[in-house]
A protein has these predicted regions:
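Extracytoplasmic gate region of multi-pass secondary transporters
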Residues: 40-41, 231-286, 290-291, 376, ...
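Juxtamembrane intracellular "pre-TM" segments in multi-pass secondary transporters
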Residues: 3-16, 198-238, 348-350
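Conserved MFS/SLC helix-loop-helix module at the cytosolic interface between two early adjacent transmembrane helices
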Residues: 71-110
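Residue-level signature of mid-helix packing/kink "hotspots" within the transmembrane helices
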Residues: 38, 66-74, 124, 158-159, ...
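Cytoplasmic helix-loop-helix junction between adjacent transmembrane helices
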Residues: 115-156
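Helix-loop-helix hairpin linking two adjacent transmembrane segments in secondary transporters
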Residues: 150-199
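Structural signature of the two symmetry-related core transmembrane helices
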Residues: 87-101, 307-324
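Helix-breaking motifs and short loop linkers at transmembrane-helix boundaries and internal kinks
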Residues: 52, 84, 105-111, 122, ...
Length: 415
């Protein structure tokens, strides 16, 4: 690490309101990216029918997109750790917006696949470069808590994608893609006015020097890669995602699982899509408890260096029995077939109370997701704790690459 002395850096804004605005924009960007990820699975059936292809080919699109996004993230992160991160984030957002818009305009399967892969390239930027930026806003003491919000924003985005895809796309599957494209362009414009966050500014060891006008000018190089992989903590943080995400990757099929259950009970395709999306959204609400996992991780980390790892491991292992119950317990669906979207949604929500099998399934899912969500904020925080500022984006992207392979494998196996 090196510090260069000089005049205090001139950065536009940087007051409390400006920093808060910047954090909000980052969170929204992370959410929108995951809306894009969650948009396709609820619409597998409708898109497959439109292009006259089997649903498994739409599952292949999702699996390959995971891989492309993960590979692209490594390149984005490496350049983000070397250069100004703000332009990279804006370019990445524009790329995924263009790919999402192209998906909505596609007239055949190959065009849809190409557009989704273009979007995946852009999505890789926001996750990896955005992570590097956010860690420079957070002091080590509160990393678990703030990273829980970062992870929560992504989870909410995925839920929103599932819900938006099912509700807006039940009649016309192209509509949600076009709506999301506009949202991506608006987010890019909002990002123009965010605070330029200085690399390393959240580190207590650098605070005094940076306040005195020094610049943290160390940048990653290829010579650093052996050092990064030589850290045992990094190796475990990267590799654990292969098996974990093989399981998590299959969760993108939840809307399809519940939609097919509805079809098996005689409901029409349009009603089944809405039912699948609403049930999948409800059943993943337990992810909001990642905040609790982050708080517990922060508290335990102050007592022992393995605190965050213990919280994450216990959460994942404890969730396994609940997932088994969720997937195999039968569920009776009672909604008005052919009714409007609002009526179907109200019926689904009412069935949580009126239908015991639905209530049991929801409780099981909430517990499973609540326990699993302890992993995300503590994984993020451990990467930041174990690495200097110029390495964090790259380490995150390497972990994300392995996660992407696991997600693609899980998605492909289920599909």
């Amino acid at each position: 690490m090196t510090l260069t002395k000089g005049r205090p850096a001139r950065v536009w804004g940087g007051g409390g309101a400006h920093r808060f605005y910047s954090v909000v924009v980052f969170v929204l960007l992370a959410s929108l990216d995951n809306v894009a990820i969650g948009l396709v699975p609820p619409l597998y059936g409708a898109i497959a029918d439109s292009f006259a292809v089997p649903q498994r080919l739409l599952g292949l699109v999702t699996a390959v997109s995971f891989l492309v996004s993960a590979v692209a993230a490594v390149g984005w992160a490496y350049f983000g750790d070397r250069t100004n991160r703000k332009p990279l984030l804006m370019i990445g957002t524009l790329i995924w917006a263009a790919g999402t818009g192209g998906s909505g305009l596609a007239t055949n399967y190959p065009t849809f696949l190409a557009a989704q892969l273009l979007a995946a390239v852009g999505l890789g930027a926001v996750g990896s470069v955005g992570f590097s930026v956010v860690t420079d806003l957070i002091s080590p003491r509160r990393r678990g808590l703030v990273m829980s919000f970062w992870g929560l924003s992504q989870g909410i985005g995925t839920l929103a994608g599932t819900l938006v895809g099912g509700l807006l796309g039940a009649v016309d599957w192209r509509r949600p893609f076009l709506v999301l494209t506009v949202a991506g362009l608006v987010a890019t414009a909002a990002y123009l006015f965010t605070y330029d966050i200085r690399r390393g500014q959240s580190e207590p060891e650098l605070a005094g020097a940076l306040a005195g006008g020094a610049e943290y000018d160390y940048r990653i190089s290829r010579a650093d890669l052996p050092t990064i992989l030589g850290r045992r903590t990094n190796r475990w943080l990267i590799l654990q995602g292969l098996t974990a995400q093989a399981a998590f990757g299959s969760l993108v099929w939840l809307p399809v699982l519940f939609a097919e259950r509805a079809r098996d009970q005689g409901y029409s395709a349009a009603t089944a899509i809405v039912v699948g999306s609403v049930f999948a959204t409800l059943f993943q609400l337990g992810g909001v408890l990642s905040i609790v996992g982050g708080l517990i991780g922060d508290a335990l980390q102050r007592r022992t260096p393995s605190g965050r790892a213990i919280v994450a491991a216990v959460g994942i292992l404890a969730a396994v029995p609940f997932y088994l119950v969720l997937f195999f317990v039968p569920m009776r669906i009672d909604v008005p077939d052919g009714a409007g979207t609002g009526a179907v949604v109200r019926a689904v929500l009412g069935s949580v109370v009126s239908e015991p099998t639905v209530g049991l399934s929801l409780l099981t899912a909430l517990l499973a997701l609540a326990l699993t969500s302890a992993n995300s904020p503590n994984w993020f925080a451990l990467i930041a704790d174990a690495n200097p500022p110029e390495h964090r984006g790259t380490v995150y992207s390497l972990g994300n690459l392995v996660n992407g392979v696991g997600r693609a494998a899980g998605n492909g196996l289920v599909g």
